[in-house]
């Protein structure tokens, strides 16, 4: 137990550069909160013990109450011991008995743009800390911050006192995409990912559920899609699984955004409905054909036939089931990589083209037949950028109403973001040059001669590997010159495509690289002078990575442990903590 005089010097973790009194003045202080808050003041550098009877006092709420219970248990059980210790004055006169949570508007739903701001204060001389938020979701962000300020072994827990934090995100959409079609992930894997996202203040789990390789989602109105299109009967997601994941997301302040990729990437639909899928189960790149004549961009062929009335009967059933199972207000309809060669294998489509029709008109017909139906279900439609920007098959903007359509980038870095914004569309940034977490792991084709080429990137089309530094330093609104353009950038997502990933590598592929995205989209990647702070962030991210591991997240290391125990010794210039 703690036996102290008026003040007692104890040891707490290094290293957090906080804003002290003024956002223009920073000094090194031993608090590590990830992502870094927008404003933090701790002028007296004092700490107090947490009462053995500490409680969190919060109003009852369907989702916040579960969060309060979770954080109370975490605070008592985490037993976080700092890897590096620095002295701080611990006050003896009293202990912190409770955290009082106040939410001004519990009616605010978990959707894009909801207020996630919070204010957190632990006054000197008070038995209570205070957390004020406009929404339940902002309160959850504040609870996470509070949990990260606590260290010690229960019941001897400590935290800073005389501290004030005012915090809110720069971008409303901060997400992780996980592809569960190419390889299957268990429900526990998905829930663990959502838990880690919440700890990093990420708020959108983009669930790329289906693709050509499998259709793992059991739908009440179309059960044959999963029965015949999944990778196996034990590799499906039932309605009960979906309900559990969605509920878990709400309890962690994470939206679950479903993606049913169409009309491309639908080979798995052909197992149940071969009559609505063109080029299903054909070899993806026929012998003697050029790349332009391929049937798919990777193994797993199949695209929905826009000329078949049966297509829309099935698709609308799928949409209705998705709307019923997912309360999320965004519906991701895919729309990427519609390949000309696949559609051209169908006689009816060839007849349409011979009569003067175009492939782009086929895409427009599909969108015109599905987008209004999605909108009628009170959903905003998200498509990949291809529907507007593809060089061969794209839709006229007239069929993509800006008030109902959001586009997600994945090519050409900031250039495609600029093009989408210039066209007046809202955009979610997932540039493969920066945010694709599968890149740099080689290829998966069995006999690709590119592996023998010295400058091939090891067979990975999007090599090199996207480091946490690359992710952290990327400015998603780069080159947008005015505030109106920047407002159209909703945020960003890192993407884990699963050609070479499954549950065995899930945590290490995501973390802590997704943590780098989390801070850059929450509080930015620059210091108060406008200088990139990647160099300063490395120690903080390293500490956060170790804490995530203690919380059960298998985040990969970013440095030798020796570097963390010897601050500054692994820099390129001794004592240099800022990027120039």
Curated annotation (Swiss-Prot):
Catalytic site: 337
EC number assigned by the record: 3.2.1.52
Enzyme class: hydrolase
GO CC, alphabetical: plasma membrane
Tissues in which the protein is found: Expressed in roots, leaves, stems, flowers and siliques.
Paired cysteines (S-S): 279-342
InterPro entries reported for this sequence: Beta_hexosaminidase_sua/sub, Glyco_hydro_20_cat, Glycoside_hydrolase_SF, Hex-like_dom2, HEX_eukaryotic_N
Origin: domain of life: Eukaryota
Protein keywords: Cell membrane, Disulfide bond, Glycoprotein, Glycosidase, Hydrolase, Membrane, Signal
Pfam families: Glyco_hydro_20, Glycohydro_20b2
Chain ranges passing through the membrane: none
PTM annotation, UniProt: N-glycosylated.
Alphabetical list of Gene3D superfamilies matching this protein: Chitobiase/beta-hexosaminidase domain 2-like, Glycosidases
Residues bearing carbohydrate: 53, 368, 378, 447
Known function: Has a broad substrate specificity. Can use synthetic substrates such as p-nitrophenyl-beta-N-acetylglucosaminide, p-nitrophenyl-2-acetamido-2-deoxy-beta-D-glucopyranoside (pNP-GlcNAc), p-nitrophenyl-2-acetamido-2-deoxy-beta-D-galactopyranoside (pNP-GalNAc), 4-methylumbelliferyl-2-acetamido-2-deoxy-beta-D-glucopyranoside (MU-GlcNAc), and 4-methylumbelliferyl-6-sulfo-2-acetamido-2-deoxy-beta-D-glucopyranoside (MU-GlcNAc-6SO(4)) as substrates. Removes terminal GlcNAc residues from alpha1,3- and alpha1,6-mannosyl branches of biantennary N-glycans without any strict branch preference.
Protein's name in the database: Beta-hexosaminidase 2
Organism: Arabidopsis thaliana (Mouse-ear cress)
């Amino acid at each position: 137990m703690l036996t102290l005089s008026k003040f007692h010097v104890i040891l707490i973790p290094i290293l957090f550069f906080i804003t002290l009194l003024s956002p223009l003045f920073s000094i090194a202080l031993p608090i590590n909160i990830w992502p870094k808050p927008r404003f933090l003041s701790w002028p007296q550098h004092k700490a107090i013990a947490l009462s053995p009877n500490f409680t969190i006092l919060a109003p009852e709420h369907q989702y916040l109450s579960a969060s309060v219970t979770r954080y109370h248990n975490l605070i008592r059980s985490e037993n976080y011991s700092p890897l590096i210790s620095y002295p701080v004055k611990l006050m003896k006169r009293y202990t912190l008995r409770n955290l009082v949570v106040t939410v001004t508007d519990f009616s605010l739903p978990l959707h894009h743009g909801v207020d996630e701001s919070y204010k957190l204060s632990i006054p000197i001389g008070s038995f209570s800390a205070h957390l004020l938020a406009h929404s339940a979701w902002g309160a959850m962000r504040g609870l996470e911050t509070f949990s990260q300020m606590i260290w010690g072994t229960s019941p001897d827990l400590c935290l800073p006192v005389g501290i004030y934090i005012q915090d809110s995100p720069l971008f409303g959409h901060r997400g992780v995409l996980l592809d569960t079609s190419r390889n299957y992930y268990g429900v526990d894997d998905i829930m663990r990912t959502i838990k880690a996202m919440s700890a990093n203040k990420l708020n959108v789990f983009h669930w790329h559920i289906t693709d050509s390789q499998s259709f793992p989602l059991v739908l009440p109105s179309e059960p044959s899609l999963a029965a015949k299109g999944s990778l196996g009967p034990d590799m499906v997601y039932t309605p009960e699984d979906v309900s559990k994941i969605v509920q878990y997301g709400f309890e962690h302040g994470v939206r679950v955004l479903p993606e049913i990729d169409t009309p491309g990437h639908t080979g798995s639909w052909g197992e149940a409905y071969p009559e609505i899928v063109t080029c299903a189960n054909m070899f993806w790149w026929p012998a003697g054909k050029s790349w332009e004549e391929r049937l798919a961009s990777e193994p797993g062929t199949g695209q929905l036939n826009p000329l078949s009335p049966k297509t829309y009967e099935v698709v609308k059933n799928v949409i209705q089931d998705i709307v019923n199972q997912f309360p999320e207000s965004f519906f991701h309809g895919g729309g990427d990589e519609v390949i000309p060669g696949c559609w051209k294998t169908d006689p009816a489509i060839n007849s349409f083209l011979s009569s003067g029709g175009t492939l782009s008109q086929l895409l427009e017909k599909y969108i015109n037949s599905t987008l209004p139906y999605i909108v009628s279900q009170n959903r905003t439609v998200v498509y990949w950028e291809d529907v507007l920007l593809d060089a061969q098959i794209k839709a006229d903007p007239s069929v993509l109403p800006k008030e109902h359509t959001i586009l997600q980038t994945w090519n050409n870095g900031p250039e495609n973001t600029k093009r989408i914004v210039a066209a007046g569309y809202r955009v979610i940034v997932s540039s493969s040059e920066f945010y694709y977490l599968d890149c740099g792991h080689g290829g998966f084709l069995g006999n690709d001669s590119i592996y023998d080429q010295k400058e091939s990137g090891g067979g990975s089309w999007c090599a090199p590997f996207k480091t946490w530094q690359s992710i952290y330093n990327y400015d998603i609104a780069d080159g947008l010159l005015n505030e109106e353009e920047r407002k159209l950038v909703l945020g960003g997502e890192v993407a884990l495509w699963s050609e070479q990933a499954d549950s065995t590598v899930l945590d290490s592929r995501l973390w802590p690289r997704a943590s780098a995205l989390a801070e850059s989209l929450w509080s930015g990647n620059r210091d108060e002078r406008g200088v990139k702070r990647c160099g300063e962030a490395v120690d903080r991210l390293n500490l956060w990575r170790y804490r995530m591991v203690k919380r059960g997240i298998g985040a990969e290391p970013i440095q030798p442990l020796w570097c963390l125990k010897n601050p500054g010794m692994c820099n390129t210039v001794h004592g240099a903590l800022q990027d120039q």
